[in-house]
Amino acid sequence: MAILKVDTISGIGTEGPVFEGDIEFTSQNFLTLPKGDTIQRGRGRGLIVANYIQPANYNTSEFITIQSMGNSIDFGDTSAAVRSHATLASSTRALSASGYVAPSNVNTIEFFTIATQSNSTDFGDLLGGSGSYAPISNETRGIFAGGYAYPATFNNIDFVTIATTGNSQDFGGMTTLRADGNRSAVNSSTRGLIAGGYISPTGTNNIEFVTIATTGNSQDFADLTAGRSNFTGLCSSTRGVFAGGTNPSNNIIDFVTIASAGNATDFGDMFTGNSVACCSTSNNTRGVIIGGDLQPADTFTNTMQHITIATTGDSLDFGDMLTTGAYRNATSDSHGGLS
């Protein structure tokens, strides 16, 4: 039973009720008021793009509702079966770029309309063709940093305007050339962090940052709690969280405050154990870590696990993907760069 008492309701039949003056809400349970316009209130979708199930790539994509635990649902397909690609998004459009399409790496960029289940559409091309880019985005701009195409490693950074199809443009370069791509990224609406990667003979703990709205080379930020590659990153508008990885394999979750340069701090552990090549997505409160290659058994999993970004602690079960797999990539319409 709910009781709503107001002095005046106006606009009936035209623009809906308008509440004027002081309004007081009393609830015996939890009360969350909506914010934003109608489209914004519908946000919260995580998109998981393509897949790798040893020994083959797949072009299938799936989606989840981040705030509601449960299994993934089929979304659509990329134009080619791909792995080690990079995905990023505005609140309406998701881009998937580069990656390995047998027998070589590609430089293609495709896009999905996040609210509509459908196949991808051609967007344009990156300046170079490689895999394992670190993706960064806000509502306007998408950035792809680094890249790896055996045996070559790249430190270039490209950018695109997400709302406008076309080829990428040069943004700058990364300060640290990592001997293997496989780095991760998190971002707010203004700053992007690029973390980890492989510098022989082990994973690096280096974190660099870029200012999204301006072009230029990356700058030193701080260090992860442990050097690693093949791991994932997710974020709220203030906090970036990194999970899993290899060199060596681990179940580490650590975090940084994006606006303040400083070393990462322990967050908790992944309940699945050591996970390599998992991916992740988030809204401003919840992060979801998806799939991966569990070590040392070398077993691909379809498990999804979640964390509350603002509070530390171990991950908890979220649901299952339709298929097992690793080397996917994921994004959302409500990640930290959009909040």
Report the location of each language-model feature.
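Polar, enzyme-active/binding microenvironments
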Residues: A2-S339
